[in-house]
Amino acid sequence: MRIIYKQQTMNNNRRDFIKKLGIATAAIAINPLEAKNLLDTSEPKTTNKPIVLSTWNFGLHANVEAWKVLSKGGKALDAVEKGVRLVEDDPTERSVGYGGRPDRDGRVTLDACIMDENYNIGSVACMEHIKNPISVARAVMEKTPHVMLVGDGALEFALSQGFKKENLLTAESEKEWKEWLKTSQYKPIVNIENHDTIGMIALDAQGNLSGACTTSGMAYKMHGRVGDSPIIGAGLFVDNEIGAATATGHGEEVIRTVGTHLVVELMNQGRTPQQACKEAVERIVKIVNRRGKNLKDIQVGFIALNKKGEYGAYCIQDGFNFAVHDQKGNRLETPGFALK
């Protein structure tokens, strides 16, 4: 009886392989990557979890905070909120939260969004006087029927939830703004001080993904300007069946391609996180060139993570880096870039 069972199993496996081979052969002309996945008969790889990724070198410190949650079996959602809050609280980080550079009117306006494993999302944009927009975004997600609040409405909601109203313009940021007023030249600088939006994505021990993204936006922007960071699908996107991605750099260029949604969809089609980030950047490069803009004045970087804990990153030009924390430790990595 045991021998017959083994023979039946072998026959079933052979039939399954032949079936896969036929489907994959037909798929090659349409999508080689999908065909490769169909032919893959190897055992599933061990998932690298928990793991957290974040943008730029200040991500190293943010990762440490996130890891305190993940290493104890905590949720990815709690980890990403705690991680980016650390950067929001730091007045020396001039592009996020307290101490962020103001707009051209001298007003510090903050953007943030958060997304969990169940497609729950919350976002705030152009919000003033609240140090931790990421936590307000989470409150929008958990305590309102909406997904985004902006401006005075976001502030009113934050105050109703017990958040403290504060002056976010530090003496150093105010001094720089007054110097800028002498010329009022507006030209965002690529990779300025290696600081920009902090985006963070994480996979917890339960295999669930979440992400967070927060920024004070471009320095000396027009009042009311909103970039990609608070926009789900642009600055951040999470699909718990596939993976997560977040972006940094010139938000207008990310918005044009709905960049992080594109990265996750490319992973859905079979690309690795690295391949997906590279292809998304290449699409932005193509669009920038088509619009006749100077690519040297533009930076966009993506980081991505899939359900296996595999990750990748890519950017337009040299200068971007990202932080990774997993069981191997916390480290800074430099991705490939398109503009050589």
UniProtKB/Swiss-Prot annotation:
It is found in: Periplasm. The active site is at residue 197. It is an enzyme of class 3 (hydrolase). Cleaved into an alpha and beta chain by autocatalysis; this activates the enzyme. The N-terminal residue of the beta subunit is responsible for the nucleophile hydrolase activity. Substrate binds at residues 225-228, 248-251. It catalyses: N(4)-(beta-N-acetyl-D-glucosaminyl)-L-asparagine + H2O = N-acetyl-beta-D-glucosaminylamine + L-aspartate + H(+). Residues 1-45 form the signal peptide. One of its GO terms (biological process) is proteolysis. Its EC number is 3.5.1.26. GO terms for molecular function: N4-(beta-N-acetylglucosaminyl)-L-asparaginase activity; peptidase activity. InterPro entries: Ntn_hydrolases_N, Peptidase_T2, TAT_signal_bac_arc. Gene3D superfamilies: (Glycosyl)asparaginase. One of its GO terms (cellular component) is cytoplasm. Keywords: Autocatalytic cleavage, Hydrolase, Periplasm, Protease, Signal. SUPFAM superfamilies: N-terminal nucleophile aminohydrolases (Ntn hydrolases) (SSF56235). PANTHER family: L-ASPARAGINASE (PTHR10188), N(4)-(BETA-N-ACETYLGLUCOSAMINYL)-L-ASPARAGINASE (PTHR10188:SF6). Cleaves the GlcNAc-Asn bond which joins oligosaccharides to the peptide of asparagine-linked glycoproteins. Requires that the glycosylated asparagine moiety is not substituted on its N-(R1) and C- (R2) terminus. Heterotetramer of two alpha and two beta chains arranged as a dimer of alpha/beta heterodimers. Belongs to the Ntn-hydrolase family. This is N(4)-(Beta-N-acetylglucosaminyl)-L-asparaginase. It comes from Elizabethkingia miricola.
